[in-house]
């Protein structure tokens, strides 16, 4: 048996964060238990969990402090309320049948305990660590979370230390606002007027990038933290190098021209996968986007069917969307050029996942209102808007 459990309960500074292992005495957890008890580390000395002095918890439990213990006051917290909480939680887990009583002598538990250096309230320390330990044991014994739960939650969750959700493109459709203006002050003004939305992407257009360089991404992040930022480089050569520049600048996605040599496109897509950002192939002026995609050994994350600003009176190429999606994978299709509020639904019905809008928003007299009009056409609620969260 090798089981892993984790739980966080309470508020700072007494907050409890428990990581634990449960396993057989004769298995890897048992070996780690023996090593931990005999190989001591200054400030992180492990101790056996006891109900009271001379009364070990069963299964035998080793407590390991996560935070360096620097003085006797901090040591007293570990040896007092934290140790008592862990021991009681283990004993109660056995009594309640969470840990089978008949296996209490066969198993060992290693519990890693976090105690904030500013924690003072013994009662809160005890209650938080008791609850967190008991919950972590239950989760370990039940195999929580399973893989399906992790996959469901991974894009919905916000880590409290991080403070915001890092967007991924898992819940289309999205509105992508493209900035083809070059005045950085004007860009920041428009950004400040755009409403918050889980379905909104920010694109730094090619003219803006040429004027200010790839570091314009960081300017956007300072003005609008947590944004999904697309860097439109329209890469035609040195695909891997330009994608790496975009990734190093903290872009979430980079645009490669579909007119580039096949090798350049493939190198760019592979570099994007390597660095963890999205690859977008822009089919601006490409006669047969499907043919280009079929010639590639690796597909991009997004294909953009792009009608140029200078060609906005010509016909859209949305009819190729189903064929593009049939090529496999989770490929998304973005449409750009001549998108207005009154034709967004047409694009979505054609299969578009991302609606790219530029001047209709960025040069609007009322940026917020115009953005909200486009967002309303997506008919998507905010992620977990109606879920009341504790932990799950």
UniProtKB/Swiss-Prot annotation:
Example GO molecular function: 3-dehydro-L-gulonate-6-phosphate decarboxylase activity
Catalytic activity entry: 5,6,7,8-tetrahydromethanopterin + formaldehyde = 5,10-methylenetetrahydromethanopterin + H2O; D-ribulose 5-phosphate + formaldehyde = D-arabino-hex-3-ulose 6-phosphate
Keyword Ubl conjugation: no
Disulfide bonds: none
Region (3-hexulose-6-phosphate synthase): 162-392
Catalytic residue list: 17 (proton donor)
SUPFAM superfamilies xref list: Ribosomal protein S5 domain 2-like (SSF54211), Ribulose-phoshate binding barrel (SSF51366)
GO biological process, one term: carbohydrate biosynthetic process
Classification via CDD domains: KGPDC_HPS
Entry's EC annotation: 4.2.1.147, 4.1.2.43
Keyword annotations from UniProtKB, A to Z: Carbohydrate metabolism, Lyase, Multifunctional enzyme
Residues annotated for substrate binding in this entry: 19, 48, 66, 68, 83
Keyword Cell cycle: no
Primary role: Catalyzes the condensation of formaldehyde with tetrahydromethanopterin (H(4)MPT) to 5,10-methylenetetrahydromethanopterin. Catalyzes the reversible formation of ribulose-5-phosphate and formaldehyde from 3-hexulose-6-phosphate.
Protein name: Bifunctional enzyme Fae/Hps
Source organism of this protein record: Methanothrix thermoacetophila (strain DSM 6194 / JCM 14653 / NBRC 101360 / PT) (Methanosaeta thermophila)
